[in-house]
C-alpha cells in the first residue's frame, strides 16, 4: 500500500507501536480486573493492595497517552468507591 520508502517505514513503525500499545492496554485491564475480583471475593486487604498496583498502572497509561487522563481518574474513583463500600 505504501508507495515510498518513508511511508513503508512509517507503516512498519505504526504496526509495531499498535502491538506494543495493545499489550500495555491489556496489562492495565488485567490490573483493574484483579482489583474487581478481589472486591467480588470480599477480600478488602487484597483489593487494597491490588488497587495500589492498578492505580499506578492507570496513571502510567494516562501519562503515556494510551488512555485519557480523565478516564484514569474516573476508573480510580469508581474502583476506590467499590473498595470503600466493602467496609
Curated annotation (Swiss-Prot):
Alphabetical GO biological process terms: translation
GO molecular function: small ribosomal subunit rRNA binding; structural constituent of ribosome
Claim: rRNA-binding is one of the keywords in the record: yes
GO cellular component: cytosol; small ribosomal subunit
Ranges of biased composition (kind: Basic residues): 9-20
Top-level division of the source organism's lineage: Bacteria
Region of interest: Disordered: 1-27
Keywords associated with the record: Ribonucleoprotein, Ribosomal protein, RNA-binding, rRNA-binding
SUPFAM superfamilies xref list: Ribosomal protein S20
Pfam family, one: Ribosomal_S20p
Family to which this protein belongs: Belongs to the bacterial ribosomal protein bS20 family.
Biological function: Binds directly to 16S ribosomal RNA.
Protein name (Swiss-Prot/TrEMBL): Small ribosomal subunit protein bS20
Annotated source species: Hydrogenovibrio crunogenus (strain DSM 25203 / XCL-2)
Amino acid at each position: 500500500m505504501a508507495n515510498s520508502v518513508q511511508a513503508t517505514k512509517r507503516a512498519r513503525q505504526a504496526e509495531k507501536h499498535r502491538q506494543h500499545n495493545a499489550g500495555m492496554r491489556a496489562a492495565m485491564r488485567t490490573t483493574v480486573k484483579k482489583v474487581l475480583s478481589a472486591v467480588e471475593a470480599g477480600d478488602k486487604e487484597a483489593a487494597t493492595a491490588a488497587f495500589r498496583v492498578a492505580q499506578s498502572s492507570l496513571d502510567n497509561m494516562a501519562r503515556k497517552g494510551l488512555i485519557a487522563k480523565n478516564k484514569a481518574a474516573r476508573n480510580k474513583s469508581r474502583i476506590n468507591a467499590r473498595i470503600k463500600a466493602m467496609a
